[in-house]
């Protein structure tokens, strides 16, 4: 399991420009991530997804996020997420630990 505090720093540096995590948070360039775990791809209400995201059909969890965050465009070809990914395993673990906590509140 990753380090939540380190994950928060990673989120602020690499994700917060496009995403929010809190309940009722607004969509930015990317969708609000509240209640992400257990949700299927392309299902954040009120966000306009690509067909690739809608049709991927996986449920977000630790394993799927771990793979996606390494290389989003490889995992979901056609996604509009322009982020190149996080290559370091420990950084992905930390970010997922933070997201698991922050998106559940």
Swiss-Prot record:
PTM notes: Binds 1 heme c group covalently per subunit.
UniProt keyword terms in alphabetical order: Acetylation, Electron transport, Heme, Iron, Metal-binding, Mitochondrion, Respiratory chain, Transport
Subcellular location per the Swiss-Prot or TrEMBL entry: Mitochondrion intermembrane space
PROSITE patterns given in the database record: CYTC (PS51007)
Positions bearing N-acetylglycine: 2
Amino acids binding heme c: 15, 18-19, 81
Main subcellular localisation: mitochondrion
SUPFAM superfamilies: Cytochrome c
CC annotations in GO: mitochondrial intermembrane space
Keyword Transport on entry: yes
MF term (GO), any: electron transfer activity
UniProt xrefs under InterPro entries: Cyt_c-like_dom, Cyt_c-like_dom_sf, Cyt_c_1A/1B
Record's function text: Electron carrier protein. The oxidized form of the cytochrome c heme group can accept an electron from the heme group of the cytochrome c1 subunit of cytochrome reductase. Cytochrome c then transfers this electron to the cytochrome oxidase complex, the final protein carrier in the mitochondrial electron-transport chain.
Family assignment from sequence similarity: Belongs to the cytochrome c family.
Protein name: Cytochrome c
């Amino acid at each position: 399991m990753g380090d939540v505090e380190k994950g928060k720093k990673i989120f602020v540096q690499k994700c917060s420009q496009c995403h929010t995590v809190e309940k009722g948070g607004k969509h930015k360039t990317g969708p609000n991530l509240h209640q992400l775990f257990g949700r299927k791809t392309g299902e954040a209400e009120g966000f306009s997804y690509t067909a690739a995201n809608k049709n991927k059909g996986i449920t977000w969890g630790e394993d799927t996020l771990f793979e996606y965050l390494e290389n989003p465009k490889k995992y979901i070809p056609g996604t509009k997420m322009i982020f190149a990914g996080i290559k370091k395993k420990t950084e992905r673990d930390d970010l997922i630990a933070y997201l698991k906590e922050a998106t559940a509140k």
